[in-house]
């Protein structure tokens, strides 16, 4: 017979009295209120000590045995939170988890004194019929409490060093006519984690504009990403699938504008490379054309403001982080934020159109990761939790999925808790 699982409240009181876990402490003399560190895993300054209470509970319940099991900080945190939320007589008094300097939560005993929990009690910890908070966080816990989440392989640092194998061009999206039912995915697999798996090919929709006129659109999928070039005859040893922008003579009539556009295209040289590594999209300029970029709306670039940056030459630069996008998407699904932006706009060969209409620029290119568009569309049509919708991730080895709104939100939360928050200059 195995060791009985301890009850969360007596165990927690004993940890508070010991005072050995970083940031876990009583906050009043009557010992009715206590604080728990609640730093999000996305924060750059997150340390293992910030998750000490969650690991201790995982060890106490037998969910984690050091040396045998792999550490899983997001799951520890989720299970601890779920155990607290089920407890009658305990309430969340203050939620300071968004505090930039000291994120934490303060809980309070309301129906019984601490003395009731002062002695260790190893009777089974059952769910009981206690009141449960109706926050989205608790709904996610109920959905994810019994899941076994496999860690992702280390994607390694971004690199442009290896020439790609030939990629089929273009690749069509899988049909939505026969979506794969959700149960076929397996009980422990979060399908959204495929977005981060090394080797999974993101699909990019590339649209080019000459003086505001759309002249080109193509959907590309290649493990090494893509490379915008201005000539069919390019350096095939460079990485990324070459996407050749069309000659302006095919769509423009003004000879002067045609001449300027051709000059810009000729200066692209090796091209503008864009690829994914981990949760980041990276870009690098391989030619002479200065290129500015911004993350904006699909319909038009954010021309009323300055660019987000300039694509660096001869080194990679981060242009999109999936982590904040997913955080904003979760907020959007909860109705408390705007739809996150995901379209990358590039102004090639000229300064960013900050004070002028973007249609005056010679060459503007929009790149949309179609998987991100699909995630936003799923959030928009989610509606009631009982409503099933279909989402197509538009990445390799994936098929359309039928998910309820609650399943979708739960998978988003699980995805973001497993991410790292890295600056674009870090690997």
UniProtKB/Swiss-Prot annotation:
Expressed constitutively in a variety of tissues. In the absence of viral infection, maintained as a monomer in an autoinhibited state. Phosphorylation by TBK1 and IKBKE disrupts this autoinhibition leading to the liberation of the DNA-binding and dimerization activities and its nuclear localization where it can activate type I IFN and ISG genes. Phosphorylation and activation follow the following steps: innate adapter proteins, such as MAVS, STING1 or TICAM1, are first activated by viral RNA, cytosolic DNA and bacterial lipopolysaccharide (LPS), respectively, leading to activation of the kinases TBK1 and IKBKE. It comes from the Eukaryota. Residues 141-427 are annotated as: Mediates interaction with ZDHHC11. It holds the Pfam family IRF. The modification (Microbial infection) Phosphoserine is found at residue 175. Residues 91-107 have a biased composition (Basic and acidic residues). One of its GO terms (biological process) is toll-like receptor 4 signaling pathway. Residues 5-111 bind DNA. There is a cross-link at residues 193, 360, 366 (Glycyl lysine isopeptide (Lys-Gly) (interchain with G-Cter in ISG15)). Disulfide bonds join 267-289. Constitutively phosphorylated on many Ser/Thr residues. Activated following phosphorylation by TBK1 and IKBKE. Innate adapter proteins, such as MAVS, STING1 or TICAM1, are first activated by viral RNA, cytosolic DNA, and bacterial lipopolysaccharide (LPS), respectively, leading to activation of the kinases TBK1 and IKBKE. These kinases then phosphorylate the adapter proteins on the pLxIS motif, leading to recruitment of IRF3, thereby licensing IRF3 for phosphorylation by TBK1. One of its GO terms (molecular function) is DNA-binding transcription factor activity, RNA polymerase II-specific. Monomer. Homodimer; phosphorylation-induced. Interacts (when phosphorylated) with CREBBP. Interacts with MAVS (via phosphorylated pLxIS motif). Interacts with TICAM1 (via phosphorylated pLxIS motif). Interacts with STING1 (via phosphorylated pLxIS motif). Interacts with IKBKE and TBK1. Interacts with TICAM2. Interacts with RBCK1. Interacts with HERC5. Interacts with DDX3X (phosphorylated at 'Ser-102'); the interaction allows the phosphorylation and activation of IRF3 by IKBKE. Interacts with TRIM21 and ULK1, in the presence of TRIM21; this interaction leads to IRF3 degradation by autophagy. It is linked to Encephalopathy, acute, infection-induced, 7, herpes-specific: A rare complication of human herpesvirus 1 (HHV-1) infection, occurring in only a small minority of HHV-1 infected individuals. It is characterized by hemorrhagic necrosis of parts of the temporal and frontal lobes. Onset is over several days and involves fever, headache, seizures, stupor, and often coma, frequently with a fatal outcome. Key transcriptional regulator of type I interferon (IFN)-dependent immune responses which plays a critical role in the innate immune response against DNA and RNA viruses. Regulates the transcription of type I IFN genes (IFN-alpha and IFN-beta) and IFN-stimulated genes (ISG) by binding to an interferon-stimulated response element (ISRE) in their promoters. Acts as a more potent activator of the IFN-beta (IFNB) gene than the IFN-alpha (IFNA) gene and plays a critical role in both the early and late phases of the IFNA/B gene induction. This is Interferon regulatory factor 3. It comes from Homo sapiens (Human). The lineage of its organism: Eukaryota, Metazoa, Chordata, Craniata, Vertebrata. The gene is IRF3.
